Regions:
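Acidic (Asp/Glu) and glycine-rich low-complexity loops/linkers
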Residues: 1-81, 87-100, 104-119, 123-139, ...
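Structural signature of tandem-repeat unit edges
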Residues: 165, 185-186
């Protein structure tokens, strides 16, 4: 392995490899005034590894982005960032657990056995992957988008933000819940679904018929009437519900 660290006179890194754990720590000897003047400087750390299959990994980053390109495969993955983005295009064979406090999560072409992605403030984008089991997402403030994804089940929660399922299909149940955001389906599908919003709309196009049970307090409901397909429970307080089936 080769490690490259961008440093300055008073900001440097220590590297330790102990018990199979690689720890890279940034040491900052600057005063707070010097740090203000240094705002925006890119103290990037790059770890070069041969492409191939690796054992379980656990990435933890306090301040900064984590990016892993294609060509790497891990038996399982945990990745956590406090302030920064997670951008992952690597392969994962087992469970993938991704957490971010402030920042976005972008996952492309990952097909783990299960996937759990959560952020406090930021967007979640998952695309072009097949999850062997459950796919779960959670966001406090930010949008969630699943694009060209497949899984056994979808479970998406958002407090303030939209949830979009675009050309994504699960063989089991789809669950989506948001307080002040919308839920949209762009030619998505599932066996059964349970969708709930407080002030958001539920709209879009599904690929197969459903038996709809749709309720709203002050909004409008426009869904197909069918006796075929799985149960689709949709409820909202002040939003509209508009669903069509692709012909």
């Amino acid at each position: 392995a080769r490690i490259e660290c961008r440093e300055s006179e008073k900001v440097y890194h220590t590297v330790e490899n102990s018990g199979g754990t690689l720890t890279i720590t940034q040491v900052n000897k600057k005063s707070w005034i010097e740090n203000l003047a240094d705002f925006g400087y890119d103290y990037r750390v790059t770890v070069y590894l041969p492409t191939g299959i690796y054992n379980a990994v656990d990435f933890q980053c306090s301040t900064g982005n984590l990016s892993i390109p294609e060509g790497f495969v891990f038996s399982s993955m945990k990745a956590k960032s406090t302030t920064g983005n997670l951008s992952l295009s690597c392969g994962v064979l087992g469970e993938a657990e991704l957490k971010n406090t402030t920042g976005n999560i972008l996952v492309d072409k990952m097909s783990p056995s299960s996937l759990n992605a959560s952020v406090s403030t930021g967007n979640i984008t998952l695309k072009n992957g097949t999850v062997g089991g459950a796919l779960k997402t959670s966001s406090s403030t930010g949008n969630t988008r699943l694009e060209n994804m497949e899984a056994d089940s979808f479970d998406a929660h958002a407090s303030t933000g939209n949830i979009t399922f675009s050309h994504s299909v699960c063989s089991g149940q789809l669950k989506a819940e948001t307080s002040t955001g919308n839920v949209r389906f762009d030619e998505a599908d599932c066996d059964t679904m349970k969708v709930k919003t407080s002030t958001g709309n539920v709209t879009g196009v599904l690929l197969s018929p459903k038996i709809f049970y749709a309720t709203t307090s002050t909004g409008k409901v426009n869904v197909p009437h069918s006796t075929e397909g799985g149960l689709a429970e949709i409820s909202t307080s002040t939003g509209n519900i508009t669903i069509t089936i692709k012909e």
